[in-house]
């Protein structure tokens, strides 16, 4: 939704509101998004129908013979909304109890300040002496992401705002639990101790 984009775009928000108020029906990917649309744009909730996104299970199917390593993944566009800074802080704390791990950040910079944010993240890694534990891979094809999911033990997703975290469903489909914050749509799809872990704060 435009009202939550990095670098608030009034023109986009106005267009979204015009489209939504003029439409007979609106689709939302989660209960969270359904409520958000209704409250943010003053839309009758009865007009909003929830249709949960699916995934290609022929692609995101686990290799049961794969040898999983101490690899963590953070997959998503590099922008402040996605909360990668929190992930790095979490990794810095985690290192105090376990030093044998590496976390790959997959995704390119996005939004008005994405490139600047990526530079800040890399500086944060250096300041915390996490160079051997954190690697930035930027954009990768789905086939390569699947390979990494087969090798990984955890997906970390610390987005500040997520109407539907498709990457979490993809990871679960590959047998990878998800560590995330108790916000947005994640309480609808992640159940602590079952397919992942939720926390109010990770640091």
Describe the role of every protein-language-model region.
Residues 139, 147-152:
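Short alpha-helical donor nucleotide-sugar binding micro-motif in glycosyltransferases
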Residues 168, 177-180:
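Short hydrophobic beta-strand element within catalytic cores of glycosyltransferases
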Residues 7-26:
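Membrane-proximal helix-turn-helix segments that form the acceptor-binding/catalytic region
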Residues 32, 54:
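Carbohydrate-associated surface elements
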